[in-house]
Amino acid sequence: MRRQLLPALTMLLVFTVITGIVYPLAVTGVGQLFFGDQANGALLERDGQVIGSAHIGQQFTAAKYFHPRPSSAGDGYDAAASSGSNLGPTNEKLLAAVAERVTAYRKENNLPADTLVPVDAVTGSGSGLDPAISVVNAKLQAPRVAQARNISIRQVERLIEDHTDARGLGFLGERAVNVLRLNLALDRL
């Protein structure tokens, strides 16, 4: 029995050290070395105060700010309740909520009734915490933001261009605008 127990305990100890100490330290080291900002949460500051993360959406409702995607994550982008709605595409509750959001989006942005509304403006993301909106969504909100801040639409469009992220690896997904970064840039004007 001792002949079998000693190798088993040795392997348990070796793999505990590898998977419990060596591997986590290596991953943390690589993350800090090559992706320090992301590994530390991509925290954004204003006046030396941390106000959020570039990776987690925040609720903005004032007319002078760009509005994020709708969130199913509790009240106002509650990270502790992160999730999508889990309602299927034919669910009556989801369809009614999307129709209501389309009407509200057109109204708050003074858009004609026949304006196509970007899907990201009326549907939540899988996590419910998506920090970005599409470029089309941002451009449709730009006139409202410019009017509320009493600045030119061109200034707002320039900020949108400056804060548009490229596609992942240059070809994956769509270009997107980080709402928190864009709103912080607006506040700096």
Curated annotation (Swiss-Prot):
Record-level GO BP terms: potassium ion transmembrane transport
GO cellular component: plasma membrane
Molecular function terms, GO-annotated: ATP binding; P-type potassium transmembrane transporter activity
UniProt entry keywords in alphabetical sequence: ATP-binding, Cell membrane, Ion transport, Membrane, Nucleotide-binding, Potassium, Potassium transport, Transmembrane, Transmembrane helix, Transport
Compartmental location: Cell membrane
Keyword Membrane in record: yes
InterPro entries xrefs: KdpC
Topological category with respect to the lipid bilayer: Single-pass membrane protein
Main localization of the protein described in the UniProt heading: membrane
Pfam families listed in its UniProt record: KdpC (PF02669)
Bilayer-crossing regions: 5-25
Nucleotide-binding listed as a keyword: yes
Role noted for this protein: Part of the high-affinity ATP-driven potassium transport (or Kdp) system, which catalyzes the hydrolysis of ATP coupled with the electrogenic transport of potassium into the cytoplasm. This subunit acts as a catalytic chaperone that increases the ATP-binding affinity of the ATP-hydrolyzing subunit KdpB by the formation of a transient KdpB/KdpC/ATP ternary complex.
Subunit structure: The system is composed of three essential subunits: KdpA, KdpB and KdpC.
Similarity comment: family membership: Belongs to the KdpC family.
Name listed for the protein in its UniProt record: Potassium-transporting ATPase KdpC subunit
Organism in which the protein naturally occurs: Mycobacterium tuberculosis (strain ATCC 25618 / H37Rv)
Lineage per the UniProt record: Bacteria, Bacillati, Actinomycetota, Actinomycetes, Mycobacteriales
